[in-house]
């Protein structure tokens, strides 16, 4: 019974709030930033505020695809720089 209640509450939350996002507690980033890690290569995101590097994230990703997918990202922010997988691949 409790399992059914848990799943019902989880899916209700998913419908109203959206699926839970992945966050890195050590980093300061825009809301709802989502990180998807794959294999093969590395990529990352760096954030600079007032000329200082606050956060550097790296993860593995599939060739040719971005590691970082997001919703409601402030792309106009001058301090945000997104790196996709490096080329050429080895």
Swiss-Prot record:
GO terms for molecular function: toxin activity. Contains 4 disulfide bonds. Residues 1-18 form the signal peptide. The keyword tRNA-binding does not apply. Expressed by the venom duct. One of its GO terms (cellular component) is extracellular region. Residues 19-49 form a propeptide. Keywords: Bromination, Cleavage on pair of basic residues, Disulfide bond, Secreted, Signal, Toxin. It comes from the Eukaryota. The modification 6'-bromotryptophan is found at residue 75. Transmembrane segments: none annotated. It is found in: Secreted. The keyword Secreted applies. Belongs to the E superfamily. The cysteine framework is XXII (C-C-C-C-C-C-C-C). This is Conotoxin Mr22.1. It comes from Conus marmoreus (Marble cone).
